[in-house]
Amino acid sequence: MLTIQFLCPLPNGLHARPAWELKEQCSQWQSEITFINHRQNAKADAKSSLALIGTGTLFNDSCSLNISGSDEEQARRVLEEYIQVRFIDSDSVQPTQAELTAHPLPRSLSRLNPDLLYGNVLASGVGVGTLTLLQSDSLDSYRAIPASAQDSTRLEHSLATLAEQLNQQLRERDGESKTILSAHLSLIQDDEFAGNIRRLMTEQHQGLGAAIIRNMEQVCAKLSASASDYLRERVSDIRDISEQLLHITWPELKPRNNLVLEKPTILVAEDLTPSQFLSLDLKNLAGMILEKTGRTSHTLILARASAIPVLSGLPLDAIARYAGQPAVLDAQCGVLAINPNDAVSGYYQVAQTLADKRQKQQAQAAAQLAYSRDNKRIDIAANIGTALEAPGAFANGAEGVGLFRTEMLYMDRDSEPDEQEQFEAYQQVLLAAGDKPIIFRTMDIGGDKSIPYLNIPQEENPFLGYRAVRIYPEFAGLFRTQLRAILRAASFGNAQLMIPMVHGLDQILWVKGEIQKAIVELKRDGLRHAETITLGIMVEVPSVCYIIDHFCDEVDFFSIGSNDMTQYLYAVDRNNPRVSPLYNPITPSFLRMLQQIVTTAHQRGKWVGICGELGGESRYLPLLLGLGLDELSMSSPRIPAVKSQLRQLDSEACRELARQACECRSAQEIEALLTAFTPEEDVRPLLALENIFVDQAFSNKEQAIQFLCGNLGVNGRTEHPFELEEDVWQREEIVTTGVGFGVAIPHTKSQWIRHSSISIARLAKPVDWQSEMGEVELVIMLTLGANEGMNHVKVFSQLARKLVNKNFRQSLFAAQDAQSILTLLETELTF
């Protein structure tokens, strides 16, 4: 027997999706494989998803896999690589508490006296629709069905039918939906799930309906006892597949409570299963109120992926009497507004306008090329493993793919992918990219990424073993097939080739020879292909660092694989808990190595990127910019934040930071240096076109202040528009800011404003400012930083003096557009 010991790396514990993936990995072997959770002293058949879930395994639990059988050595090698490298990817990223914390109710809403019910935010957003109550199904009628001689046959038929339905949905879905449906399919195909139902029928003589329900109750009770919220919330998945089985078995008894949404609807239910959610017309699903759903349920994951706002914590009996009435579900402030009046509806129309502006601006920002504050260009690219990930990466602002892990095509299968399959996969991502560069890393297999059909013998130290470019000569046919596929696809886009695990010049010379042979073959075969291709290497073996100058004669670029390079440089296994604290790329030795690579490559006109985890770490971005890297490639969700941060950094200041870091004596000194590093704040003018509006159709004072504060949030002048608005209202309550002549000047000095601003809205028609000075049709809002030297009283006074001048006022009211107002104010005012 062989054993793999590890700490559970899953933040949410061993729930349905990772259990399904682990079961799939284990099921391909003849050996018996037992999963053990040592904290719980729980054992499970690793080829059963349900048994794995039942171990109650949480993050960082001490676990092991015991493997015993004829193929135990090969199984251990492959499963160890899976546990160490890919197991964590089967978990899902959950929203932070900050993302699920409701904003305090803004004054611009509370002053309108809305009829509100308060709940808890589960998925952020705002939805407007009709409240519709969905009653829960009762299972009592199924439990009462007597046992029948046909029950066993019925069970097998229902399981097969449900599996067929799920497989059909899998063919039609992608993303989170596909992942969750796969987990459900795994559960119904699980021997333990169906076996328990059969035992209840044979040993306890229960009818099929009662056996399905009793099995559901037993499994749910075990999950409900878990210490993990995430595992407790898998109860919904067990209930979902069990109820589907019941409805398939007796469709005539009672149709499932499916709802047809014919107009925008806010759905109110005790709970909603994933399959019920997927059956809804999402175009008309404005939001959901779910009484008992937790923040990590699969239904919530689907809702967030579909941008459906969700609240909980509202008792159904408190909402039932409002069924059929219009409402606004505000999952930003955590409220449900019942029967909103015109003023409340107007508030949410303004909120939607701001949300649309924000979404448009984010899309524009993502599409912009990445520059530092002083216009130093740096490419921001994505790391992906399949062509399906490419559109999402580009939507996040990826300017290309810095690492396409082609080995994913070779893994988890019985035979190698042929040339046509590879060509189609590579062509798909190139077509999605347009003219964006795609760097294909040739197959990094062998060693820690064992491929059974290659029959590479087991190694004592696979991370330092027979892998990547080292295996290519033995498997030259396999490598040539990949080269042919990439060269064919390269004729459809900007393809580049990167070779992993290179340690010497002879390897790259051999590869270049193979590329030329592949080109000759493709010409001979009359297949469309690229005549040349940009070639680079992964810099992950320390020996390469000392001969970068020689490699510059043979390749076009370098990409530093910081994960493996860190391990090899320090001789540290990052998966070994006894030495993993030593795994830290931010040390003087590592930074000096990066500096040497970049300097040598740049001297010879070659570019250098980084494609390990380090590339997406925002804390270390100033160092990477300062070291002169030309490209950062990272997980695509990190791209928007990295681009935004980069725009705030001055490359010269970062270069000095990197120089100082390389002179430090320890990692602790570098961390202290980073903590003390404060990027110079970009300076924005007090007056700017982005904050000036004409002919705004506001119906009240509240909408004007709401819009102007919210717009400052959209434009990045504040990260806290709700808090800034509160400061404006507090000043407004001391004395109204109407100054006469149809003008109001709301103002505040606030800690929540990042860039002091003057915002202007000239209204389409006057509004009541609740002031003795009469109605207002021009709003000039001053928001100055609390710690800035600018005196808001002086600014206010200068504006007031100008407004006394009739000609100045008339010019403001007569201005044709926002630019005319800006030009007038810049001419007349001095701050």
Swiss-Prot record:
PANTHER family noted in UniProt: MULTIPHOSPHORYL TRANSFER PROTEIN 1-RELATED, PHOSPHOENOLPYRUVATE-PROTEIN PHOSPHOTRANSFERASE
CDD domains assigned: PTS-HPr_like (cd00367), PTS_IIA_fru (cd00211)
One Gene Ontology term of the molecular function aspect: phosphoenolpyruvate-protein phosphotransferase activity
Domain comment quoted from the record: The PTS EIIA type-2 domain is phosphorylated by phospho-HPr on a histidyl residue. Then, it transfers the phosphoryl group to the PTS EIIB type-2 domain.
Modified residues (Phosphohistidine): 15, 298, 747
Binding site for Mg(2+): 540, 564
Enzyme's top EC category: transferase
SUPFAM superfamilies in the cross-refs: Enzyme I of the PEP:sugar phosphotransferase system HPr-binding (sub)domain, HPr-like, Phoshotransferase/anion transport protein, Phosphoenolpyruvate/pyruvate domain, Phosphohistidine domain
Record: active site: 15, 298, 611, 747
Residues annotated as domain HPr: 1-90
PROSITE patterns: PEP_ENZYMES_2, PTS_EIIA_TYPE_2, PTS_HPR_DOM
Gene: fryA
Family: Belongs to the PEP-utilizing enzyme family.
Keyword set includes Magnesium: yes
Domain PTS EIIA type-2 span(s) in chain numbering: 685-828
Function: Multifunctional protein that includes general (non sugar-specific) and sugar-specific components of the phosphoenolpyruvate-dependent sugar phosphotransferase system (sugar PTS). This major carbohydrate active transport system catalyzes the phosphorylation of incoming sugar substrates concomitantly with their translocation across the cell membrane. The enzyme II FryABC PTS system is involved in fructose transport.
Protein known as: Multiphosphoryl transfer protein
Chain positions recorded as phosphoenolpyruvate binding sites: 405, 441, 563-564, 574
UniProt GO cellular component terms: cytoplasm; membrane
